[in-house]
Amino acid sequence: MVKILEKIFGTKNERELKRYFTIVEDINRLESQISSLSDEKLKQKTDEFRERLAKGESLDDILKEAFAVVREVAKRTLGMRHFDVQLVGGLVLHEGKIAEMKTGEGKTLVATLAAYLNALEGKGVHIVTVNDYLARRDVQWMGAIYNFLGLSVGVIQPDASFLYDPNYRLPDRRFDRLRPCSKKEAYLADITYGTNNEFGFDYLRDNMRYSIDELCQRELNYAIVDEVDSILIDEARTPLIISGPSEESTDIYYAVNRIIKYLKPENDFKLDEKLKTVVLTEQGSQKAEKLLGIDNLYNPSNIQVVHHINQAIRAHYFFKKEVDYVVKDGKIVIVDEFTGRLLEGRRWSDGLHQAIEAKEGLKIEAENQTLATITFQNYFRMYKKLAGMTGTADTEASEFAEIYNLEVVVIPTHKPMIREDYPDAVYKTEKAKYEAVVKEIEECYKVGRPVLVGTTSIEKSELISKMLKKKGVPHNVLNAKYHDKEAEIVAQAGRIGAVTIATNMAGRGTDILLGGNPEFLAREMLAGKDYTEEEYKKALEKAKEICKEEHDKVVSLGGLHIIGTERHESRRIDNQLRGRAGRQGDPGSSRFYLSLEDELLRLFGGERLQSLMHFLKIEDDTPIENKMVSKAIENAQKRVEAHNFDIRKHLLKYDDVMNSQRNEIYSFRKEVLESDSLKDKVFELLEIEIDEMVDFYLAQESEGVEKLKEQLSARFDIEVDLSNKSKDEIKEYLLEKLREAYEKKEQKIGQELMRDVEKMIFLHVIDTKWKDHLLGIDHIKEGIGLRGYAQRDPLVEYKKEAFELFEEMSRNIISDILTRLFKIQIKEESQVKVARAQKIQRSDGDGARRPVEKPKKIGRNDPCPCGSGKKYKKCCGKNS
């Protein structure tokens, strides 16, 4: 029935495209009118649009003209005109949807349309890229359009921030036209480019600031996420964590690592390769107890040891060197499983990183305690409007809709796609597969046809590299180890005779032009020389001629050939690799070479194929090439995708609990930060605290009143008479006494200083308690899986316990803030003068210096001078 209706009315995607192309026709009709405007008149359009918005028009009212203006400015500044399909892409982005546009269709240029239109509101637009190089490159490239139209453009990087300035010229092309600025300035720009990591971390950092002037980000208004599938799906489960060192010893990691070689799979522990989980058997537990000299591994005091053993087994059996991580300068550096890039500075959490350090015999860095954390899923769901672009999103359309409420619109290519995708070639062994891959590379190289080979790990790319060296085939290896030259290698991967081996999707974001990229070639020709703008232009002209000649030759050879050496768990990643060929109507082809020893086939249905090959007596070096086989593999991928989606959906339910708590704490913290006076808030908290204290102590039959008086004296320094008063009268009386005491303290300290002290104590207590809460949540997560064995729903139990923990934290925050405020002691003026005088070094008439008395050093076990009643090391001395 659905199919019949689709035939009559078209699919939803087709109906949407029809609507968009109608709007595009209206934009095209404005082209001649807009192109007749002078530069000056064109520049004035931005102010005109802003005035119209101020008078009550909406963005949709000015959309057609704004898009026509951006198209004209792109022609004048970059010599590039937006195609109709690119205008459709801009419309999709403006409506807060995902535009699926194939590789080479100009997504970078598409973003300028929606970014310009939405920036006119003055609330900020964030354009999110997958790496820092692309963020910088896109600002340098597209900055000319925004600058012409009077918009400011910023770019945030981990160690610096910049504003686009066409007059700021540098010989170093990486930073040319990028004027250094503060991070806050970059965020105040109309449009800000940066990576998902940087935007997310800045959000967390802002929620740890102690002054409103230090905040960088504005309200999260509108984001355009480039390579949206990579960021919102592949990295969705990755939490961004800001952490500080914990006080635990690292010896346990070495001790546990030493016993792993004595524990055997199956007998001592069970491995689940699909879920990457470990379970100790009864025999394994007893063996571990004996080896570690522990009586009972499951005694509550040893529960962390069980966790460390599990992580050590995972480190040895699931995490492979040169695949999941590399050892660099004595440190473990994670390899991104999706892009093959090195993730410098990133660490696995939960003790896994330390377990791998122990496995490799490296110095173990102490496990960090989480200070602030958020997942990409929850960060990006905070934007008022979210949109995205990618070459491959349709396979995950249901996930985008369900989790982010984002619709995917598949946009047709500007020119028909003529790439030929051959069926998979499946071999019995990995050895036979790689020999076939190298043979095919050799054949392409002999005729000069460029080849791009996609591998799933550094190890595999280096294996192919070794085999090619033996055959004398020159090639470039592009993996996590050499990502500095990534863009240059990818840009020239379409030249005659180029052989490029790329780990996974490294180099994403840079187009492979058949015949090569003239800009990169021109820079290569001038490498190591000081050159003028004129010399660069000449080199560029020469490079264009060379590339044009090579382009025609490569086209006649059939274009770029893609070889995949293994299927990824996700069809989308495979499609991304294929999508590197056949851009903008160019010819091209692709083929995947697989073996029954590949991980995907081994875990999902390789046995059936193996028995089929055995039954048909197929030789090791003879491949099966059959559409049915490719279909079976695709079905295996669909199963894995569905499985991974379920995991992400399930984890999101857990994370939503944390998310609502985070929002609660951060909005309270923001209220504190933005407040000029917290005095009313202090009195509000006093009412809550006195209510609870009186109810609690008066419920105790004997000595309740005396205990209440003791508490009031210890915490608030007040003596009270509670005789002959009802419960409500006691509450009213105590509030009156405490307000008086607070007013006196304020008079003594001074109004202005008291406001500063309030803010400092509020923020310090909130941060300390939130940090402790995050640790508590981690402990709940560790044990929650065991609830399933007691026939309880772990999610329900987690929600209940997390809520109780949050309630407890909220009570502790109120209690701690009030105790500290009432205990605070400020030195009197005379004491301050004496203290200052002691610090000044006076000299005698003969020039000899008098000894300066050192103030008494506070010992770590001394009472904290802030008056909290805690030891100095557990309070203000914690971070000393």
Curated annotation (Swiss-Prot):
Biased composition (Basic and acidic residues): 841-860
Required cofactor names: Zn(2+)
Positions bound to Zn(2+): C864, C866, C875, C876
Disordered as annotated region, ranges: 837-871
Annotated localization: Cell inner membrane; Cytoplasm
E.C. code: 7.4.2.8
Cofactor note: May bind 1 zinc ion per subunit.
Annotated catalysed reactions: ATP + H2O + cellular proteinSide 1 = ADP + phosphate + cellular proteinSide 2
Superkingdom to which the source organism belongs: Bacteria
Keyword Nucleotide-binding listed: yes
GO molecular function list: ATP binding; metal ion binding; protein-exporting ATPase activity
Database matches in PROSITE patterns: SECA, SECA_MOTOR_DEAD
Pfam family, one: SecA_DEAD
Entry keyword annotation includes Glycoprotein: no
Keywords on record: ATP-binding, Cell inner membrane, Cell membrane, Cytoplasm, Membrane, Metal-binding, Nucleotide-binding, Protein transport, Translocase, Translocation, Transport, Zinc
Record-linked InterPro entries: Helicase_ATP-bd, Helicase_C-like, P-loop_NTPase, SEC_C_motif, SecA, SecA_CS, SecA_DEAD, SecA_motor_DEAD
Binding site for ATP: Q86, G104, E105, G106, K107, T108, D511
CDD domains: DEXDc_SecA, SF2_C_secA
GO cellular component assignments: cell envelope Sec protein transport complex; cytoplasm; plasma membrane
UniProt topology in membrane: Peripheral membrane protein
BP GO terms, sorted: intracellular protein transmembrane transport; protein import; protein targeting; protein transport by the Sec complex
Subunit structure, interactors included: Monomer and homodimer. Part of the essential Sec protein translocation apparatus which comprises SecA, SecYEG and auxiliary proteins SecDF. Other proteins may also be involved.
Function: Part of the Sec protein translocase complex. Interacts with the SecYEG preprotein conducting channel. Has a central role in coupling the hydrolysis of ATP to the transfer of proteins into and across the cell membrane, serving as an ATP-driven molecular motor driving the stepwise translocation of polypeptide chains across the membrane.
Protein name: Protein translocase subunit SecA
Lineage per the UniProt record: Bacteria, Pseudomonadati, Nitrospirota, Thermodesulfovibrionia, Thermodesulfovibrionales
